Amino acid sequence: MAVPKRRVSHSRAAKRRTHYKVTLPVPVKDKDGSWKMPHRINKTTGEY
């Protein structure tokens, strides 16, 4: 069974976690000129 040899320090774990960044979703302009999130149904036109 795989067991770590020693405990990972808080600073080392935080340094590893710096690479996991959250990206903000970018809204796109629809055919009718309204802004919507990509891959969502537009409430005004009903298009995907």
Curated annotation (Swiss-Prot):
Xref: Pfam families: Ribosomal_L32p
The keyword Ribosomal protein is annotated on this UniProt entry: yes
Residue stretches in coiled coil: none
Gene Ontology MF annotations: structural constituent of ribosome
InterPro entries per UniProt: Ribosomal_bL32, Ribosomal_bL32_bact, Ribosomal_zn-bd
Highest taxon, organism lineage: Bacteria
GO cellular component labels: large ribosomal subunit
Region (Disordered): 28-48
Single Gene Ontology BP annotation: translation
Keywords for the protein's UniProt record, in alphabetical order: Ribonucleoprotein, Ribosomal protein
Family that this chain belongs to: Belongs to the bacterial ribosomal protein bL32 family.
PANTHER family assigned: 50S RIBOSOMAL PROTEIN L32 (PTHR35534), LARGE RIBOSOMAL SUBUNIT PROTEIN BL32 (PTHR35534:SF1)
Name of the molecule in the record: Large ribosomal subunit protein bL32
Organism encoding this protein: Campylobacter concisus (strain 13826)
